[in-house]
C-alpha cells in the first residue's frame, strides 16, 4: 500500500505506530531525530509523513520547511502529532499547511486510522482534529 515515514523521538510511540501501519498493510519506517528523518525522507520518498512537533534539534516548523524545500518531499502530506501544542498553534506557525493535519497525543486509535486513510486518499477532514 502506502509508504509512510515517522519522525519522532519517542520510541514507544514510534513502535506502536509502526505496528499499526504495518498491520494495515503499509510500508513504514522511522527516524528518531530530524537529520536522519530528512535523509530517510529523501531516500524513501514517502506517500505520507508523521512528524512529532517537538523534538531535540529542530521544531516541527523547521523540519516542515526543510521538507517543503526538498523536491522529494515538497508535496508529501504531513500529519503532525504533539502532546504540547494545539492544532491552531502548529498550523498557524507553518507557512503552507496545505495537506497537513494534526492529532493530539495521546492519539485515539480510530482517529489515527481514519486520519491516515483520509490523508492518503487526499480527503478533507470530516471534523476538526
Predicted regions and their residues:
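Short hydrophobic/Thr-rich beta-strand motif most characteristic of the beta2 strand and flanking loop
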Residues: 25-32, 40
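Acidic catalytic/metal-coordinating carboxylates
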Residues: 32-36, 59-65
Amino acid at each position: 500500500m502506502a509508504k509512510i515515514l515517522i519522525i519522532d523521538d519517542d520510541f514507544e510511540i514510534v513502535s506502536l505506530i509502526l505496528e499499526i501501519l504495518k498491520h494495515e498493510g503499509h510500508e513504514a519506517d522511522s527516524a528518531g531525530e530530524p537529520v536522519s528523518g530528512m535523509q530517510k525522507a529523501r531516500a524513501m520518498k514517502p506517500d505520507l509523513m508523521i512528524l512529532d512537533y517537538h523534538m531535540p534539534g529542530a521544531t516541527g516548523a523547521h523540519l516542515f520547511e526543510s521538507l517543503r524545500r526538498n523536491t522529494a518531499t515538497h508535496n508529501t502530506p504531513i500529519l503532525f502529532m504533539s502532546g504540547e501544542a494545539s492544532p491552531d498553534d502548529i498550523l498557524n506557525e507553518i507557512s503552507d499547511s496545505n495537506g497537513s493535519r494534526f492529532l493530539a497525543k495521546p492519539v485515539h486509535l480510530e482517529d489515527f486510522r481514519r486520519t491516515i486513510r483520509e490523508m492518503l486518499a487526499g480527503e478533507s477532514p470530516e471534523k476538526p482534529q
